[in-house]
Amino acid sequence: MISINDLSLSFGGFTLLDNINFHISDGDRIGLVGKNGAGKSTILKLILGIESPSSGKILKPVDLKIGYLPQQMAHNKDKSVIDETMTAFADILALNDKLDAISQELAERTDYESDTYQKLIVEMNDITDRLSYLSGESPQMLAEKTLVGLGFKREEFNRATSTFSQGWNMRIELAKVLLRRPDILLLDEPTNHLDIESIQWLEEYLQGFPGSLVLISHDRKFLDNCTNRTVEVLLGHIYDYKVNYSKYVTLRAERIEQQKAAFENQQRMIEKSEA
């Protein structure tokens, strides 16, 4: 799905990422970990194309739908909570309009064997398939269900987003990202502004999410419950572990011990050769 090949990023004489390589496949659930400033958020921005590497390439399908929740964003909107959330369905609503138009045209045509008629049938079936994930629920119902899951009360749906704090506006943005049903989710500290109940709801949602996930979080339990692969960013390099966070901690400790033992053995060999 996404390949990061020989990627480096330097600025001001400092190398943040040094020739890193890794691949994100369909269904991968990756926890991106490392100290603050290691480059985790930058990797997400590089994948999105918000930032450009100094060298190397990121390969991804041109039609890949990426959902991205940054750690911080500005909010200057006067729409109601529900109206702002419903903007996530702009593409879906456009598809519904197109489906209605095709259905109307098919009803008026009688050239059933023509190429044009058959193409309309194919297009209608394609749109129907793309809309099938709604599972009988209207966009409004899905939006309301997601907002409730993220902690909003129904009586708050018609309040202006400008009357809510940045934390609550981030919940609205998260709802929109989830409702767009992307092929891959890139989430940067999504639990920062969530209470326990909302975190539990988000965990359950992500566990059932059929796409790929790249998650940055300081919540170890959340990482364990939502990911099965851990990519550590350390001093410009990455270390890829095919396990969740807790198992990664154990394997990382073993790796450090092995490196320490190898270094000590090398030092002993040097001392012997110089004796």
Residue ranges of predicted features:
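Short cytosolic helices in intracellular loops of multi-pass membrane proteins
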Residues: 267-275
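ABC ATP-binding cassette signature C-motif
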Residues: 1-265
